Amino acid sequence: MKVLLLEDVKNLGKAGEVCEVKDGYGNNFLIANKKAKLATNEVINKYKAEAKKKAEKEALEKAQKLQMVETLQTITLTIHKKVGANGSLFGAITKEEITERLKEQHASLNLDKKDIELKHPIKSTGIYEIEVKLGSGVVGAFKIDVVAE
């Protein structure tokens, strides 16, 4: 019996492969547990079409993320905060505050606070480089300029 694996199966194969298995193993374990489907031409073609569509969607998303990184690299975000006598801020600048200011000044960029990586808390004025991880291995950075009010 030939089956198309829907997920990786130990000692048999990886998802998307067509494997020859015994009838009992195929029907009673693989197909019953939705780990495989009976490998007909229709099922194989449908699986290949879905895989192709998924790959195209992932490529489009990655291209959009790369475009966002290029845009981010040109940005210098300015944040005005109250400062004490010694030049330190009252409180720290948070990821949430950075995303809010980014949305205010650059509405086209839609970043979530979980995408921003702060290496250390920002507690004084100056220019800082903020790292952004957008997923799919796409990493970028932009600068923020913290100035006294």
Curated annotation (Swiss-Prot):
Belongs to the bacterial ribosomal protein bL9 family. Coiled coil: none annotated. GO terms for biological process: translation. Pfam families: Ribosomal_L9_C (PF03948), Ribosomal_L9_N (PF01281). Gene3D superfamilies: Ribosomal protein L9, C-terminal domain, Ribosomal protein L9, N-terminal domain. Keywords: Ribonucleoprotein, Ribosomal protein, RNA-binding, rRNA-binding. One of its GO terms (cellular component) is ribosome. It comes from the Bacteria. The gene is rplI. This is Large ribosomal subunit protein bL9. InterPro entries: Ribosomal_bL9, Ribosomal_bL9/RNase_H1_N, Ribosomal_bL9_bac/chp, Ribosomal_bL9_C, Ribosomal_bL9_C_sf, Ribosomal_bL9_N, Ribosomal_bL9_N_sf. PROSITE patterns: RIBOSOMAL_L9. The keyword Ribosomal protein applies. Binds to the 23S rRNA. One of its GO terms (molecular function) is structural constituent of ribosome.
